[in-house]
Amino acid sequence: MTTPWGERVLSRFPEDPRDRLRAWDASDEYLLGHLAEREVPLSGTVVVVGDRWGALVTALAPHRPVQITDSHLAREATRVNLERSGVEPGSVRLLTTQDPPPDRVDVLLVRVPKSLALLEDQLLRLAPALHEGTVVVGTGMVKEIHTSTLRLFERIVGPTRTSLAVKKARLIFAEPDPALKRPANPWPLGYRLPDDVGRLSGRPVVNHAGVFCADRLDIGTRFFLRHLPAPGRFRRVVDLGCGNGVVGTAVSLADPDAELLFTDESFQAVASARATYRANEVAGQAEFRVGDGLAGVPDGSVDLVLNNPPFHSHQATTGATAWRMFTGARRVLRPGGELWVVGNRHLGYHVRLRRLFGNSELVAGDRKFVVLKAVKE
């Protein structure tokens, strides 16, 4: 990537030579160009929120920025890209969305996330650190910035306007208003599940902002909860890509002797899973881990993997994440261990499972979703 401060060699994480998606886009370039052309003072505390693969903080590393991200993969990509660019790792402070934000912010740069709820939570958490002189600039592709996006900046930060579009990217400029009466932060959000989801019917769930379908139970998970495996056969169970943890919590409620691992690459998701598990006062054993899929889980150590794989990476549709999850599951399963997957029928996961495991069984299905089982032989 060419920046006003020189060339940067960037990659997504984990690196895949077959992946043609770049680690930056026109919105990153637009923001960096604006900062240089307008000679925006990058002194004091510079905070970069939602930098997807570390492109912004790598370019701005000489100014010792603070990165705030919800993504473990984005955080690891940032580390790799900083090292590749010869930047001292200590020059960038890496925070997660679960960490306390800085007490004072002099420059706030926001890569607009897909989730409006996550943007709301981030702005509300950072707002007390803003002052009248804080420079606030958001960036995103035109298709990612909506009237609701601008209203959030207006309601939480202050008067807001946008730039002209360049290469289908747009900037957002907000002026902090010290007199603004901001709303209370509604996140995390708690509610009770419907009465038709098996073991978790009527039970509480807790969602932090940014978790998929944060204000309701998504229909794929609802279908999965109705068709989970019978309890008592599995000792080591992994809820892979756990989201708010309802699937693993349902298993643990049915079989308190099972040892559960909840894992997701989202810090918000794992915090939600932990809160959901505690809200249901489960008596079982559970570990909650933010990470890259099943990295760090020993080979042949797991009896059951439960998975509702995502098939979008930001705005791109891709099956790469599901395939990595499936291959990881095969590695960690014991012989005879099972992978249970829910997915949209049109995604054809049964083909991939047969290719990888040599078998795939349809457990349940309707017009939209299927639950599939693959056994490691």
Curated annotation (Swiss-Prot):
It is found in: Cytoplasm. InterPro entries: DNA_methylase_N6_adenine_CS, RM_Methyltransferase, rRNA_m2G-MeTrfase_RlmG, RsmC/RlmG, SAM-dependent_MTases_sf, Small_mtfrase_dom. Belongs to the methyltransferase superfamily. RlmG family. Its EC number is 2.1.1.174. Specifically methylates the guanine in position 1835 (m2G1835) of 23S rRNA. It catalyses: guanosine(1835) in 23S rRNA + S-adenosyl-L-methionine = N(2)-methylguanosine(1835) in 23S rRNA + S-adenosyl-L-homocysteine + H(+). GO terms for biological process: rRNA base methylation. Transmembrane segments: none annotated. One of its GO terms (cellular component) is cytoplasm. This is Ribosomal RNA large subunit methyltransferase G. One of its GO terms (molecular function) is DNA binding. The gene is rlmG. It comes from the Bacteria. It is an enzyme of class 2 (transferase).
